Amino acid sequence: MTVHFPFDNSYAALPDNFFARVAPTPVAAPRLIKLNRPLAERLGLDPDWLDSPEGAEILAGARLPEGAASIAMAYAGHQFGQFVPQLGDGRAILLGEVIDRDGVRRDIQLKGSGRTPFSRMGDGRAALGPVLREYIVSEAMAALGIPTTRSLAAVLTGERVVRDQIQPGAVLTRVASSHIRVGTFQFFAARGDREAVRALADHVIARHYPEAAQADAPYLALLEGVIARQADLIARWMMIGFIHGVMNTDNCSIAGETIDYGPCAFMDTFDPKTVFSSIDHMGRYAFGNQPPIALWNLTRLAECLVPLLSADEDKGVEIAQTVLGGFAERFNATYLAGLAAKLGLFTTQADDAQLSQDFLAAMAKGRADFTLTFRRLSDAAIDPTELGTVRALFDDPAAFDDWAPRWRQRVTAEPQDGAARQAAMRAVNPAYIPRNHRVEAAIRAAVDKDDFGPFHELLTVLTNPFREQPEFDRYADPPQPHERVLETFCGT
């Protein structure tokens, strides 16, 4: 029996310099760890077959399904501000594209599937730890409502890989709206290949921004669309305390999805300077730097598109600068509206933005836990005078004590009753996030003991992040001092 992948491959129809055709490297003994059955069904795939030994072979790259494109995509990128003219998929192979049940085109990619022409000195493989991290966090982000790539499956290869230590090898099957990045445009722009930039832009418009095709200036509309999606995405990150960790231009999705989870982390104690990534020595990608870094990345995209914006280079630059100037307004509108909702404010008053910013400042001064503070504020929404459980989260509650009466006065001016206010706040303030120490514990159990129980349990909790789960209350707790994760690692 063979499974049918209803491939409809568009990227593989682009010119040959957009990718390299390469087959996955077979592995010794594929063993399925986790299959995302609801996602498989959404993609029009048979989850029962994928859950079989033959399915595991497909998901590990040991066999290719009929009609697979099997390509490694070319791209460049700025890595920590330094331009690298050729990167590309060094350990990932795009099997192909399918149209899901919602009519949306989706990439299906194997990550850790062997060497490609873009591997440079790498082995093309993935270690189990990073595969589990991406599976956990990407699926948690989806449950939180954040645009993201998805994880269809995680498979053990039966082989070992050498990183800082020897680990079991694994393959992640990743699903995305596409894997086109800012760095994909940079790859061709750096080579002066304007026709390739135009072909890529036309492909992106057709796939992700069809409304731009009807605009008077389609490439300008494309740039505006990418800027809007990135501004909204980063605002959503900031609302949940997510730190990407490696916001290079090759990790910036043109589709506006969170991609490449590497050394990502979630903030515990609120501090805008928080950095977890072991390779971010200067704090370039710290939590509070994410909005300006996103704008920096978008500026690199705009540079690639200047020749398409106007035949006159100076005019093209002027157009790009004007459009980039709209990033801050879009980001602030999304971010401040989100913060207001987290505080239970669903009408608008002039001082709402200041109230939100003052709350964040109080959290920073008091070293309060970001996620738990907002959640407990939601719990107090029925009776805004009962803020003791929120206050208890602050090492130094002085600033919170100054802020709390202002919030009480403001929130009681809202038209909802207490129960409706609480329900609305709980719908945007999660009880459960992928706490770094919980993710690390799940990874360690799997890598060190071949015990996937903590991994599966954590996924169960994170599938419903906004709903109280009394049997899993411990997953809402911040880490104890001895549990704190101080650094996260890329895993490549």
Curated annotation (Swiss-Prot):
InterPro entries: SelO (IPR003846). One of its GO terms (molecular function) is AMPylase activity. Pfam families: SelO (PF02696). ATP binds at residues 88, 90-91, 111, 123-124, 174, 181, 260. Transmembrane segments: none annotated. Its EC number is 2.7.7.-, 2.7.7.108. It catalyses: L-seryl-[protein] + ATP = 3-O-(5'-adenylyl)-L-seryl-[protein] + diphosphate; L-threonyl-[protein] + ATP = 3-O-(5'-adenylyl)-L-threonyl-[protein] + diphosphate; L-tyrosyl-[protein] + ATP = O-(5'-adenylyl)-L-tyrosyl-[protein] + diphosphate; L-histidyl-[protein] + UTP = N(tele)-(5'-uridylyl)-L-histidyl-[protein] + diphosphate. Its cofactor is Mg(2+); Mn(2+). The active site is at 250 (proton acceptor). Mg(2+) binds at residues 251, 260. Keywords: ATP-binding, Magnesium, Manganese, Metal-binding, Nucleotide-binding, Nucleotidyltransferase, Transferase. NCBIfam families: PRK00029.1. PANTHER family: PROTEIN ADENYLYLTRANSFERASE SELO, MITOCHONDRIAL (PTHR32057:SF14). Nucleotidyltransferase involved in the post-translational modification of proteins. It can catalyze the addition of adenosine monophosphate (AMP) or uridine monophosphate (UMP) to a protein, resulting in modifications known as AMPylation and UMPylation. Belongs to the SELO family. This is Protein nucleotidyltransferase YdiU. The gene is ydiU.
